[in-house]
From Swiss-Prot:
Its EC number is 3.2.1.54. The active site is at D210, E239. This is Cyclomaltodextrinase. Optimum pH is 6.5 with beta-cyclodextrin as substrate. It catalyses: cyclomaltodextrin + H2O = linear maltodextrin.
Length: 473
């Protein structure tokens, strides 16, 4: 890695929020705020009405009214769930609900409450020892950005900041409203770094780079240099939809490779992903800083991809036990469903009677385990078995180790050899969910597995009278 990862990242569980769809603050409704949207060409919709795809992508102009005030009001919920880092999709001035088409990076959108709401949210989170990560969209801007409007008029100061041709311009995925910036131009580089530094000075804890693959390794590096120049404890994660190795100029990336492997495994499309997980662990220098996510604002929701709750729990177990930072997309913890964008961006459900309470409690337990267990926070990854998948998270002390088994198949007995000479003979391995005990015999343990089940096992010191098994290791 180019830079050491901030120390707090090892203990992090990230919660991703799409601000327009989370909660409306100050007791208001979207109707109360309608002028903020209508005067900028938006359309308002009642909370709870499912989002739908419209011709010409007109669904990006539909607003439900969520804001930063509302997010701040839900800090008790974040504590109840156990997360300690918020990642917000873009909050800067823009005329769409997703705000990936920035008009002004230095202005928090009034639709979200403006700068006052942003600073209030930041203060509330820091008072509860929570972190805030913002989304930096620097590969492109919106077509209403002042620079682009001037460039379209052939202003010589701005023309070279974009890629303009005779009858068109280069834009992200050829979406005309998202003109790409020429990030190699010095004025563009200085502008991006000013934005990065501005919000670091205001107190945010890090950045997520949108379209990190489009920006390329060099731009990712010089943004991280600016971040680490400000503070070694500020974090930079990049959106890279590839195999995770080779991007160690940042602290981590959004690990879509992990997501796709896990979903294929629990859905029965393959019976073996251990080789791939082990190779990625071995080859990815910043694996502990990567975000292990199962869904996001860019994918169908987990409950839609994996409708069976037992199989879904297996995916969540892997998310919280593989090296890296678990990322929970808002509402996934209560069972929200939704297909491709915009269906995956539905409003948060706040009526607990409509929640999948069993799933919510399961998430709470997994989050608590991930944040308190040394093996899961920083242990090495040692593959024990490929089908069903079993691995060891090996910590400095053997009693801190964690063994994970995930079986999406039929009932069976798994015989595991544990490659740690300090796991002593007769050591009890305790299932942290069921409380069952299984004893190690000569470095081997036999584990009965139900169909579509998992085990998370912790070694326990054996005491017999005054005798202690782990007195010298």
């Amino acid at each position: 890695m180019m830079y050491p990862m901030p120390s707090w990242v090892y203990d992090s569980v990230v919660y991703q929020i799409f601000p327009d769809r989370f909660f409306i603050g100050k007791g208001k409704t979207v109707e109360d705020k309608k002028d903020l949207y209508l005067k900028r060409g938006g359309v308002i919709e009642k909370w709870g009405v499912p989002p739908r795809k419209l011709p010409g992508a007109q669904h990006v102009k539909i607003f439900y009214g969520g804001d930063l005030w509302g997010i701040a009001e839900k800090v008790d919920y974040f504590e109840e769930l156990g997360i300690n880092v918020l990642y917000l999709t873009p909050i800067f001035l823009s005329d769409t609900n997703h705000k990936y088409d920035t008009i002004d990076y230095f202005r928090v959108d009034p639709q979200f409450g403006g700068k006052r709401a942003f600073l209030h949210l930041l203060r509330v989170l820091h008072e509860r020892s929570m972190k805030l990560i913002l989304d930096g969209v620097f590969n492109h801007v919106g077509s209403q950005h002042p620079w682009f409007k001037k460039a379209k008029k052939n202003d010589p100061e701005y023309v070279n900041r974009f890629f303009l041709y005779k009858d068109r311009h280069r834009s992200w995925f050829d979406v005309g409203s998202l003109p790409e910036l020429n990030v190699e131009v010095e004025e563009v580089k200085e502008y991006i770094l000013k934005v990065v530094e501005h919000y670091l000075k205001l107190g945010i804890d890090g950045w997520r780079l949108d379209c990190g693959h489009d920006l390329g390794p060099t731009v990712n590096l010089w943004i991280n240099m600016k971040v680490k120049e400000f503070s070694a404890e500020k974090y930079l994660v990049s959106e890279i939809w590839t195999y995770p190795a080779g991007w160690d100029m940042v602290d981590g990336l959004m690990n879509y490779n992990f997501r796709n492997l896990v979903l294929s495994y629990v859905n029965g499309e393959t019976d073996s992903i251990g080789f791939h997980l082990e190779r990625a662990y071995r080859e990815t220098k910043n694996i502990f800083g990567c975000w292990n996510m199962l869904d996001s604002h860019d994918t169908p929701r987990l409950a839609t991809m994996v409708p069976d709750r037992d199989l879904r729990k297996l995916a969540v177990v892997l998310q919280f036990t593989y090296p890296g930072v678990p990322l929970v997309y808002y509402g996934t913890e209560i069972g929200l469903t939704g297909g491709e964008d915009p269906e995956c961006r539905a409003t948060m459900e706040w009526n607990r009677e409509k929640w999948d309470v069993d799933l919510f409690e399961f998430y709470k337990k997994m989050i608590r385990l991930r944040r308190t267990d040394p093996g899961l926070r920083f242990g090495e990854f040692v593959l024990l078995n490929d089908s069903p998948l079993a691995f060891l998270r090996k910590a400095p002390h053997p009693l801190q180790n964690t063994i994970v088994v995930v079986n999406p198949g039929e009932e069976k007995v798994l015989v595991l050899s544990i490659p740690d000479g300090k796991i002593m003979n007769t050591t009890p391995l305790v299932d942290v969910f069921s409380g069952e005990r299984f004893h190690v015999d000569g470095g081997v343990v036999k584990l009965p597995l139900l169909a579509r089940s998992f085990r998370i096992l912790k070694p326990e010191d054996l005491r017999v009278g005054k005798y202690r098994l782990y007195k010298r290791v």
